């Protein structure tokens, strides 16, 4: 099967930003101008094409990463619209993992907001080249140049302003392109679909000259040959400037910055031009490298070519009411056909792909074939999980999976009736498979089912989906904080597990050294020499330790950030077994945890409050009362902006409190920042209440 679009003519991009910066509106305009959508959908009317779940249309926010395809200037653009709400950070994470480039949308009034920083760091981690779109230039308080400064200062990026805005706020009417020297003035009557191209307006000529010189100098710094030409007094051609910007963008040494107002239909076509001009195709980025599942040391390069063996990543699972299981797949090398059998390198199982679909938000186009660089949805893969690699059985390869964030909040859930019990279990299992940042677990002490997620909104949506999609009614308890335990000093434990009860006994002897491993999770080191413990028993010790750490010694919360070294031990020729060493490891680490001064940890949130000046003192006093630590204060468009760290346990009900305190005029956003030790007096209370004293 031949491909319709050459790989260099393909762009896989994400639209990412803080909530309310205008991501979905920007995507809607892109679909309108590329001819995919004949009517513009508005998020505030609940009509946006990309927001297709009922909850999204009701709440006017994007929850899942809708994927869609459009064409612009002979290029196919696959767009993934990601949520800006921190509770859905896994959706951003899995989108960035499979994208080649991204458009970061900023609010021209607010600039770089907390979630913008989080998403930017996620994109850095996955080495995703970006361009920036400063949106809402028509709003009161809009300031393009302040946004550019914030991108430099807060995100530590090198912004390349490619445009000069013509006017701002109500007077915003277009842009001047610093590369071509042409002004684009948008026609409000045609909803921005028509525009006039003119020369640089006289009142902007001086500013244009200064900014163009700054752009050329910045671009020349990225390229020795251009720097030589520039220093020699020669004029750089438009083509040379475009090529240098493209190289710098793909190398992630600079980020082009454009501006507009998506809602007023201004600046979207130049943004599309920039996507095609500056963001990479699948062949412009580093080749994907996987590992041999049988030997992780052996690296396997997966070149982006159709004729290479298949290597593809399942990055999202979803349920469609009419089709059933959908697996969203990014193909890195090779091709997939409807009806072909593929091999899951993570599970070692073979599966058959039933149908292949190109997705347009919630509409589908059936296709027979998809090649390297494509993003498609497959029907029929029943055994896959998010992060699995599918490949050919004669060339198995495992690609790097996703970083799954740990939940910070949990609630107890129970079926309203006995008849709902089985249906609830099945529905929760299905939802947990779709969304890896959502966890379901049983609490043995209370016999309750607990669901855990990234925030209250995340769990609200889950409960909502239980009713709407699965017709399951459930009662939900009050939100609980997901506390953790850790140790605060080093210790060494010598533990012998020996059991004799007629016949073959049990014998396992381990000596472990335990120390804190701050913010680095669990680490196991095997330091056994001379075969004092046979190597086939070592994994059992590790597993025993890991399972024991799931329930800490203070209050039964999971134990984190612990480094364990197995340094010595002994075994018995007859009585030793994997089970005996599993128990020895488990008991040894419990003893070590008790000796190593265990402490409780709580999730601390990064909170940003935007409040009118007259309520500042009241808001600050309240945050201090919630154990908040002020990080910074700033003024923005006539309001005060407070950034602070506050324990999650102190933030329940804050939205209602803040509303009444400021007559509804202040707002806040928060996201998980780090875990911190709980103060001794509170830790004692928590431990007592957990143990039922």
Swiss-Prot record:
Q: What Pfam families does the record point to? A: EFG_C, EFG_III, EFG_IV, GTP_EFTU, GTP_EFTU_D2
In this chain the tr-type G domain maps to 8-283
> Which keywords annotate this record?
Cytoplasm, Elongation factor, GTP-binding, Nucleotide-binding, Protein biosynthesis
| Chain segments annotated as coiled-coil in the UniProt record | none
Question: Which positions bind GTP?
Answer: 17-24, 81-85, 135-138
Subcellular localization, as worded in the UniProt entry = Cytoplasm
**GO terms (BP aspect):** ribosome disassembly
Lineage top rank: taxon: Bacteria
- GO MF, any single term: GTPase activity
Q: What the protein does?
A: Catalyzes the GTP-dependent ribosomal translocation step during translation elongation. During this step, the ribosome changes from the pre-translocational (PRE) to the post-translocational (POST) state as the newly formed A-site-bound peptidyl-tRNA and P-site-bound deacylated tRNA move to the P and E sites, respectively. Catalyzes the coordinated movement of the two tRNA molecules, the mRNA and conformational changes in the ribosome.
The family assignment reads: Belongs to the TRAFAC class translation factor GTPase superfamily. Classic translation factor GTPase family. EF-G/EF-2 subfamily.
Its recorded name reads Elongation factor G
